[in-house]
Amino acid sequence: MNKTAVFFLASALAGCASPAAVEHKHTAEVAAFEDQRPSVEMDRYTAEKLNALLKVRQQAGAQSTGQLSEQISRAFMHTPYAANMLQGSATLAEKLVVDFRGLDCFTYLDYVEALRKSTDQDSFIKNLIQTRYTGDGVHYADRRHFFTDWAHAGQPLTEDLTAQLSADAVTVTKHLNQKANGDLYLPGLPLVDRDITYIPSTSIDEQLLSRLQTGDYIGIYTHLAGLDVTHTGLFINTANGPVLRNASSKKRQREVMDSPFMEYVQNIPGIVVLRTRPDGQAFTPPSAPEIDAQSARQPSQALTHG
């Protein structure tokens, strides 16, 4: 892959970072859990913060999914943004990386979701593998490279609620991993045909906000061929209004921060909404207006191809 392709992938594929991770250049000390298989790449700062977060999780007890997600995600506020934090490719062996020194938008969600379910290091590693990969092992081919993989690949982590939240939801069939010119974003990985449903930004209003819950995972939809979203974050209700809690890659920000939600979504194509299943409970979808499948809006050719 040439340098231009690598740059484009890093900028677009997950918006904040490329799922086609390359070996990052941090030089801090690496610690491994020797009794774990596979071994875990972890620096001392991360190990200490992980232990502190696990204590917080233990003390939280049986809080709701949203409360846990808010509390854990808040602990990462102001963490520097860093791209390409994972190690692995079609030609480079995948390593299980845990690194809290810098986050991109997708690894941020990985850690929040895994920590929410964990009370000790062993359970965290197990949950991180189940969150980041579709199988039980650590393999590049099994990594959840796309945001909607969380709802549609392997054992689903979430429910895709987008179509249920708004009668204005639009569905587009995407050939994930295939650029408009036919090339692949991620060589060595297959194309995935998937219907991606998003809510246009013009349809995001107070009524929709009332159906969103703290802890919902938000993907920023893109019209680009072969991609589902270009950025991700968590929907959080705060005393000052709803925010998108995200690892921002914007030039003057570049850290985990709270972005006012309605301001953020004004100038984007739309959003995809995923919601974690309550642990051990059957999932009950939210009430929403009836949607007539025959009259649901379809995207124009221009929207389909960005």
Positions of predicted regions on the chain:
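Cationic-aromatic interfacial patches
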Residues: 22-103
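Low-complexity, Gly/Ser/Thr/Pro-rich intrinsically disordered linker/tail segments
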Residues: 214-219, 230, 234-306
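Sec-dependent N-terminal signal peptides
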Residues: 4-12
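Short alpha-helix capping/helix-loop boundary micro-motifs
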Residues: 197-208, 221-222
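Short, charged beta-turn/beta-strand-edge "cap" motif at the junction between a beta-strand
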Residues: 224-226
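Acidic/His-rich structured neighborhood in mature extracellular/periplasmic domains
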Residues: 79-195, 213, 219-220, 237-240, ...
